[in-house]
A protein has these predicted regions:
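Extended ligand-binding regions for polar small-molecule ligands
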Residues: 35, 80, 84, 161-162, ...
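Acidic, polar ligand-binding/catalytic clefts
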Residues: 79, 83, 91-155, 224
């Protein structure tokens, strides 16, 4: 190796060390001073914790574990945000809220941000500001591992004899017929009953959220199977009050670093714990975002 090359590498290492040292001495109050005077970013940093609206009854997104601790993918995203704000992922205050309160609690200032499996739509974006998505939801088919209709190919081959349960709504039939045009559709009143119809073998598959399929297969692989089909993509994002670009930029940065950068331990562990999968490997070079 040439002397010039060695000197360059030494300078590079020194630069990294200086950068790390500079980052470590930038305290929270100095960071807060950089935000616009009216930005929630300054308020949150001065307060010392972030107030997050979420739920507690919908696994794998937000629910209580056996010890009564609030966990789930949404909850992990809140801890990721706290880690970015304070270098301490525990500095979160959760406000448990009904889904109908997600937008009102943002606009009234009851919460700093809502992280509660919220689907991005243009209509909602007129009321709140959405962060970058942290998950792409979809529809998938939950099946039984011992069934002759376990895979999507088998369900397709069943034609008009294939029976699928789905939560009752105006688009239910069309949602199933997008991928199984001949299937018999059984619309049912609750998600629990949609799955119970599969358990009792009244249907061959249950059309539910992709995250639900992944969670149930991860938890009980001897009881449930994933047919291998997913469709109808929907974005899940956090939501915050409109008009606060500093706060929105910061949340997006914290999420980007956790999902695409070097601080991905929390996100990756949650993705594996709740969905049974590992995110795609991050590779240096061309940015994947």
């Amino acid at each position: 190796m040439s002397n010039e090359r060695r000197d360059f590498l030494k300078l590079g290492a020194a630069g990294l060390a200086v950068g790390a040292a500079a980052a470590s001495v930038l305290d929270v109050r100095k960071a807060a001073a950089q935000a616009a005077p009216t930005s929630l970013l300054r308020t949150v940093l001065d307060r010392g914790h972030v107030i997050v609206g979420s739920g507690s009854t919908n696994a794998p997104w937000h629910f209580e574990d056996a010890a009564g601790k609030l966990v789930g993918m949404d909850i992990t995203m809140a801890h990721i945000l706290a880690k970015g704000l304070f270098d301490d992922d525990t500095k979160v205050e959760f406000v448990q809220q009904d889904p109908a309160a997600r937008i009102p609690n943002i606009t009234t200032g009851k919460v700093d941000i809502t992280i509660q499996f919220m689907t991005v739509t243009p209509q909602r974006a007129q009321l709140v500001a959405f962060t970058r998505p942290y998950y792409v939801e979809g529809i998938a088919l939950l099946t039984l591992p011992g069934s002759q209709m376990k895979t999507f190919d088998q369900l397709q081959a069943g034609g008009a004899n294939t029976k699928v349960s789905i939560l009752q709504n105006v688009d239910a039939d069309n949602s199933v017929h997008m991928v199984l045009p001949q299937a018999q559709v059984m619309q049912i009143d609750t998600q629990a009953n949609v799955i119970q119809a599969l358990d009792s073998k009244r249907v061959d598959a249950a059309a539910v959220d992709l995250s639900t399929v992944r969670w149930m297969v991860k938890q009980t692989p001897d009881r449930y199977a994933d047919s291998g089909k997913k469709w109808f993509s929907m974005l899940y994002s956090a939501a915050l009050k409109q008009g606060d670009q500093d706060w929105l930029n910061f949340v997006n940065t914290a999420f980007d670093v956790a999902m695409y950068g070097h601080q991905n331990e929390l996100y990756d562990k949650a993705f594996a714990d709740y969905f049974g999968l590992n995110p795609p490997a991050r590779e240096p070079g061309f940015p994947s975002i």
